[in-house]
Amino acid sequence: QDAVIHLAAETGTGQSMYQIEKYVDTNIGGTALLLDILTNTKHHVKRVLVAESRAIYGEGKYHCPHCGDVYPMGRNDADMAKGDFECKCPKCGGAVELVATTEDSAIHPSSVYGIAKQVQGQLVHLVCPTIGVESVSFRYQNVYGPGQSLSNPYTGILSIFSTRIKNGHGINIFEDGKETRDFVYIDDVVDATILGLEVLKANGCIFNIGTGMATDVLTVANTLCEKYGIQVPVTISGNYRLGDIRHNYADISLARRILGFEPKFSFTDGIAQFCKWVDKQEA
């Protein structure tokens, strides 16, 4: 084989906080094993593409009118208990505006999973050049689409919400429902990954792979109900989990420029395809 696409990993951000050894051994240890094999055996591998994650950015990039671009480390319990869920400027404590997170943004993983994904990328970019193998890493946003598990809660809110809706159960949304993510459809991810293998200039690069658009969680819930034609109670609970990020969406201009990547599926189009697939499954 000429290339390795290294996607294998445990993926539960929350779960990683109480199964630390499992996530470190599987994600970092698995990458180390792959690199050991590439270093110490004969093979024909010319390029390794490793999956990093948006999780390495933590809260991501914001702009403060007084302090410029800033990278909040996280939110505090006191603010969230009062229903104030937005990030604050880490320098002046003032309000900040969300902006797209670029690849050169500060790295602030807020979970063991995020740290493990960061290390996976660092290992690949460190070792591969020393053995004559090219390296590329992709920081995927929230990937979804046909084929994802509907029974594993760690595959994301689309699976969780879909299963509840199809079974006639209500949806409980944390915080105020305005928290956002960048949802990218699997077909676009496949296209990007192929480009990551084929484009020569991608060697040694790190790319954000998403849509560059933020969608809030309440919109996700309402859109799923609409697509399935099933109305269930959608409750904004105000509950929260420390360590969850508020917002994050990708700046994909580098992937556009170097890879020629352009996402084809809007959130609405991708969700429609996803729901058609779910309708054929057993919820």
List the model feature ranges, each with a label.
Residues 109-116, 140, 150, 154-158, ...:
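The catalytic Tyr-centered alpha-helix of NAD(P)H-dependent dehydrogenases
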Residues 119, 123-127, 157, 161, ...:
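Hydrophobic alpha-helix immediately C-terminal to the catalytic Tyr-X-X-X-Lys motif of short-chain
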Residues 49-52, 137-145, 175, 206-211:
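Short beta-strand segments
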Residues 59-64, 148-152, 220-221, 235, ...:
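Short aromatic-enriched loop/helix-cap "lid" or pocket-rim segments at secondary-structure transitions
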Residues 165-283:
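C-terminal substrate-binding subdomain of Rossmann-fold SDR/epimerase-dehydratase oxidoreductases
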Residues 1-141:
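N-terminal Rossmann-like NAD(P)+-binding domain of SDR-like oxidoreductases, especially those catalyzing
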Residues 14, 32, 60, 116, ...:
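Gly/Ser/Thr-rich beta-alpha loop segments that engage phosphate groups in nucleotides
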